[in-house]
């Protein structure tokens, strides 16, 4: 009788352990593991035939549209640049990509996350660029994609689609490194200069970002935030250079669990804890994460993410004064309003530039004339910082281009 009872008890224990295992796997798949691995082949591909283990749990299947199928460029030399476009961001994202491909000499692959209605127009613009420009880049169009269970919450955090960038390490699983920028960004220096900063990371660093402010008297986080933030004045998420491999495997310290959590395990609990205390959405979550993990951040100088706050109350970005602006970030819509005409002048100069025209005459000289009309504003008085960086880029390109090409 005892033998039967022991056997019965053992069966019960095995059954309970099996149930626990099954539920744990279900919970794991419902949030992070279900993100589909997005490949970036050099030819158009459908994911309908993907294996079951790669099945996406996001609301929309991923679709690749990659240009230049016969490009000889090797995968390992590509610089990967990502952006997220929703709403009225079509013009911005195309202009941002235009600045990147105009000033860079290395091959680029663009990863563009966009709503379905924007994908067609973005594709049409990129496909219309001349062949000598298309030979410098390839691109992948991705749909906006969030975990099923919390899609609505993530998609409406701060601005529509803004929090998509939080999920890039899980979606772009085949990539080792990535440069993410907001759509309202213009490159005034080649992408390779910031991309090469990956080699400057030490053994603990996995992301490079610029401070939110340089001047404590106008800093948001140190004066108004109701949550932890990185460093003395926080960091800005408009430009992020990421080692995705490290981000996927690292366990992040936090104030919720005694042990570290992986990136994909951390995001939802963090939002649930702080959603009533955050103002700037996903940027605030990033600040909270790196408040507890400051050793993981490589600090970019402010001229790699130059915003109106760096000049609107007087110049407060010393690297820009010394070397010029390298990346211009027109946040708060200043590229499309009259609030900061100097920022708008740079945006319109690139927008009106035609590929193949002389950069000095058709871009730089016209921009200098337009900026001279903005000197009645604080940022207009500092607008020579904008052209200093661009002049360096133009000279570099002209030296690299043989006469007659």
Swiss-Prot record:
Disordered as annotated region, ranges: 46-65
Q: Identify the stretch annotated as signal peptide in this record.
A: none
Cytoplasmic compartment ranges equal 1-2
Q: Which CDD domains match?
A: GT8_like_2 (cd06430)
Q: GO molecular function of the protein, one example?
A: UDP-D-xylose:beta-D-glucoside alpha-1,3-D-xylosyltransferase activity
SUPFAM superfamilies from the xrefs? Nucleotide-diphospho-sugar transferases
Q: Which Pfam families match?
A: Glyco_transf_8 (PF01501)
The record's catalysed reaction(s) read: 3-O-(beta-D-glucosyl)-L-seryl-[EGF-like domain protein] + UDP-alpha-D-xylose = 3-O-[alpha-D-xylosyl-(1->3)-beta-D-glucosyl]-L-seryl-[EGF-like domain protein] + UDP + H(+)
Annotated TM spans: 3-23
**Membrane-side (Lumenal) residue stretches:** 24-405
Q: Which InterPro entries match?
A: Glyco_trans_8, Glycosyltransferase_8, Nucleotide-diphossugar_trans
Please tell me where this protein is predominantly located: membrane
Compartment(s) of residence: Membrane
Q: Cellular component GO terms, alphabetically?
A: membrane
Point out the glycosylated residues in this chain: 202, 243, 277, 372
Which EC class is this protein assigned? transferase
Enzyme Commission numbers on file: 2.4.2.42
Q: Keywords on this record?
A: Glycoprotein, Glycosyltransferase, Membrane, Signal-anchor, Transferase, Transmembrane, Transmembrane helix
- Recorded topology in the membrane: Single-pass type II membrane protein
BP terms from Gene Ontology: O-glycan processing
Q: Which family does it belong to?
A: Belongs to the glycosyltransferase 8 family.
Primary role: Glycosyltransferase which elongates the O-linked glucose attached to EGF-like repeats in the extracellular domain of Notch proteins by catalyzing the addition of xylose.
What is the name of the protein in this document?
Answer: Glucoside xylosyltransferase 1
Species in which this protein is naturally found: Danio rerio
Supply the gene name. Answer: gxylt1
């Amino acid at each position: 009788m005892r033998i039967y009872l022991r056997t019965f008890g053992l069966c019960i224990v095995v059954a309970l352990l099996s149930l626990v295992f099954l539920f744990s796997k279900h919970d794991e798949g419902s949030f992070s593991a279900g993100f589909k691995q997005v490949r970036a082949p050099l030819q158009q591909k459908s994911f309908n035939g993907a294996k079951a283990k790669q099945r996406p749990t996001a609301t929309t299947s991923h679709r690749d549209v990659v240009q230049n199928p016969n490009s000889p460029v090797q995968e390992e030399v590509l610089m990967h640049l990502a952006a997220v476009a929703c709403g009225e961001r079509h013009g911005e994202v195309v202009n941002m990509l235009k600045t990147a491909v105009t000033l860079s000499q290395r091959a680029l692959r663009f990863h563009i996350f966009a709503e379905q209605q924007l994908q067609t127009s973005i594709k049409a613009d990129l496909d219309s660029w001349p062949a000598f420009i298309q030979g410098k880049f390839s691109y992948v169009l991705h749909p906006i994609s969030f975990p099923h269970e919390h899609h609505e919450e993530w998609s409406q955090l701060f601005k529509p689609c803004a929090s998509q960038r939080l999920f890039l390490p899980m979606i772009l699983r085949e990539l080792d490194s990535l440069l993410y920028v907001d759509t309202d960004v213009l490159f005034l220096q080649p992408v390779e200069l910031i991309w090469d900063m990956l080699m400057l990371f030490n053994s603990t660093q996995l992301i490079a970002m610029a401070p939110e402010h340089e001047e404590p008297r106008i800093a948001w986080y140190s004066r108004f935030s109701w949550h932890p933030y990185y460093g003395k004045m926080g960091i800005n998420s408009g430009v992020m250079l990421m080692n995705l491999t490290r981000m996927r495997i690292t366990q992040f310290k936090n104030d919720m669990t005694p042990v570290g959590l992986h990136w994909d395990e951390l995001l939802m609990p963090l939002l649930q804890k702080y959603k009533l205390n955050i103002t700037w959405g996903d940027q605030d979550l990033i600040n909270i994460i790196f408040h507890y993990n400051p050793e993981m951040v490589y600090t970019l100088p402010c001229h790699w993410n130059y915003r109106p706050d760096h000049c609107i109350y007087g110049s407060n970005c010393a690297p820009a004064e010394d070397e010029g602006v390298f990346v211009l970030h027109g946040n708060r819509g200043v590229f499309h309003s009259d609030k900061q005409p100097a920022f708008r002048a740079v945006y319109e100069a690139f927008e009106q530039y035609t590929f193949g025209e002389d950069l000095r005459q058709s871009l730089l000289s016209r921009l200098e004339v337009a900026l001279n009309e903005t000197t009645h504003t604080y940022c207009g008085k500092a607008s020579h910082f904008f052209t200093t960086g661009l002049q360096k880029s133009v000279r570099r390109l002209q030296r690299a281009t043989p006469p007659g090409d």
